[in-house]
Amino acid sequence: MKRKLASILSIIIFSIMFIGCFNYREINKITFATSIIFDRDEYDNVILYIDCVRPYRNANESSDKGRRIIFKGTGKTSLEAIREMNVKSSNRINFSQVRAYIFTEQAARKGVKKYIDLINNDQEFGFKPYMFTYFGDVNTLLDVTSSDEEYLGLYLDQLVEKNRSNAKVISANVNDYITKSLVANNISYMGAFIINDDALDKKIELNGGVIMKDNHMIDRLEQKDVVS
């Protein structure tokens, strides 16, 4: 597991260095989010969970070091939740390496426009990460994520890329989602996933998608309902 995490960490650090935005010293002062989970509570507060890597790289060393951290923040808005998480982190949290935006069923039903606006208005957030609705308990997802060998965002990104030729898999990144909304009377879609506990180990499994109207979830398409 440590070997695989080190390999993933090397990929993340290489991509950061490759785009030329950070040097070794700067990387050691930043925590990078690899995925964001958007949720809402019973009081309509925004709850954010981010799966992060805190890397460490020395120009004189050949190996990459770092550790995984999962933060939770709550606020009236996403920005308030992010500020709360930054207070808990000794390093600044950076969102330029996010690979997946994940919405709980409740967040998707209540509407995702404010989250899309956050992504659209902050240059740290990219338009290439895939969007998903997660059907299940967030704590279960966090437990599976914490015990797994791979970062949630990277795992979902690789899972979609591996299944691009599978007509049963629904996928959309932020750019796809917004473009579809503009040309289809505010109707769009995104992928969905569940935790499959039929096997000996609980595993994340892509499972259909959701139909969005005016940025609110109006229907769910399970994998068995998708026409191949």
Regions found by a protein language model. Give the residues of each.
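Membrane-proximal alpha-helical signals and transmembrane carboxylates
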Residues: 2-228
